[in-house]
Amino acid sequence: MSVDIADFEKTFVYQRTATIPEVTADLKTIGQFDAYHEQQKSKWGKGMATSFFIGLVSFVSIGTSNSFQQYAVVASSWLGLCFCAFIVCAIKRSKHGASDLANRRYELLEEVLRLLEKDSASNEPVAVRIDLQKPDHATKRVREGKVGPWNVQYFLDPWLELSGRFLDGTSYRLQGLEKYQARRKTYRSRSGKSKSKSKSKSALQVTLSLKPNPKRYAESEELSAKLKQSLQLPPWSNQKFVGVHKDRLLLTALTPADWHGKPIPPNPDDDSFFSGPHLVAMMFLSLYQALNQSQLKQE
């Protein structure tokens, strides 16, 4: 059953077990939903700016007129209309802004599925869960603390889970976790006024695990020495963990905050791109290279 937008809009969480083409079709529907709300948010934002500007210009023009009393009634009506228009536009913009999703998340998943489809059976299902709610949602806050003068709220957002199986029988599981910090501090300016400043920090942590088919590959314990040698991660990412746990190969990497989910660029090693799909592709390639080396040695 395809995605139900009415249900999706309640939580902004998409969860389904289906074939890759079916999941991809759902993601395109979600993308259309997001594009509509982005357009509406922009439209009502322009309405806010227009009503504010017209009201301000009218007030200044009438206030500097020598015939202020003559235009008082008209001015009050006009300014009241602009005020009401501003409030309506603000409410509408806020409503659509709440449904303005993080494009890069579903774009990353869509691009990764496109890459995985090449080595998956056409009828092989994948299990997907993607959370498109904002990373600083109250339900994702784990603790509060202090860093120097900053009051910090810490959030953990496990927004992506994807699992499936390749044609060779290897099972995979991909997880995406956003670590988000909301920082705020209060200070006094030179004039003695109390002011506040806020900023945020975030990083994406991606974890990939592979469970090889024991009939085709050597025991996982034999792969430990090969994993670090086979790593080919983008230069802008950081390896956090690589190793073997029981019967699985594990690799965890971190990305900068400004990563995107668009297709892999012509020059993926350019630090200005920070392509999430490129990082995931290189993680798969690194682990599979270790598997293939193990298979060749076994043969």
Language-model regions: role of each:
Residues E124, V128-Q293:
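Structured extramembrane domains adjacent to transmembrane segments
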Residues S2-F12, Y288-E299:
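Terminal low-complexity, intrinsically disordered regions
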Residues H96-D136:
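Cytosolic juxtamembrane segments of membrane proteins
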